[in-house]
A protein has these predicted regions:
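Hydrophobic small-molecule pocket/channel-lining residues, especially in calycin-type beta-barrels
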Residues: 21-189
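Sec-dependent N-terminal signal peptides
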Residues: 4-16
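Short, Lys/Arg-enriched, disordered terminal segments
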Residues: 1-5, 189
Length: 189
């Protein structure tokens, strides 16, 4: 009887631990369609401190699960199309915040030679992901904006920066960047 009780307790304990480990995954799985490699060719916006204006760039993005699917790491690098000079590089860590049961973000990187960090939170509506961001550069520039990612299909999403407030001044919404998946072989007819 004692051994049966220990076995039952062990099964219940392990089941509870596995359930607890799935909470973060269950919250973050709405971002799972983004897992993979993406790219876009577009013009630099010139909005972020250190970023050139209206220059042809190539942006590469990667989304991956980390730490046993308890977080998602987004990394990117943008460089000039002509000579591959770095324009942006950065990362965002998406995690489940247990106190609010919402997805929170931590950001860091460079725009040109200007270092910045930030934080944010995620809201979802249909196939659109809204990341509300607050950033601060090493030089003291404060920028708030919303990054809007709209899933078009499994091979593409639209990426846009909206609702800009930089040092208290409104800035117009930026053009949509068309992102395409580059880690899946094209389907053959």
């Amino acid at each position: 009887m004692k051994n049966m009780f220990k076995s039952l307790f062990s099964v219940l304990f392990l089941s509870g631990a596995l359930f607890a480990q799935s909470e973060a995954y269950n919250a973050l799985k709405v971002l799972e369609p983004l897992i993979g490699e993406w790219m876009s060719k577009h013009k630099s916006l010139g909005v972020f401190e250190g970023e050139p204006d209206n220059q042809a760039i190539v942006s590469s993005y990667s989304f991956e699960w980390v730490t046993d699917k308890t977080a998602i790491l987004e990394t990117w690098r943008s460089s000039t199309e002509k000579d591959s000079k770095r324009i942006h590089t950065g990362s965002i860590l998406y995690t489940l915040d247990p106190s609010s049961n919402t997805i929170k973000t931590k950001h860091y990187g460079y725009d040109g030679k200007v270092y910045w960090t930030g934080k944010g939170w995620v809201e979802l509506q249909d196939s659109t992901i809204y990341t509300h961001v607050e950033e601060l550069t090493i030089n003291g520039t404060k920028t708030n904006y919303t990054n809007v990612k709209t899933l078009v299909n499994e091979l593409s999403f639209n990426n846009q920066y909206t609702n800009f407030i930089q040092n208290g001044k409104s800035i117009k919404d930026q053009p949509v960047q068309k992102m395409r998946r580059v880690d899946i072989a094209p389907k053959k007819d």
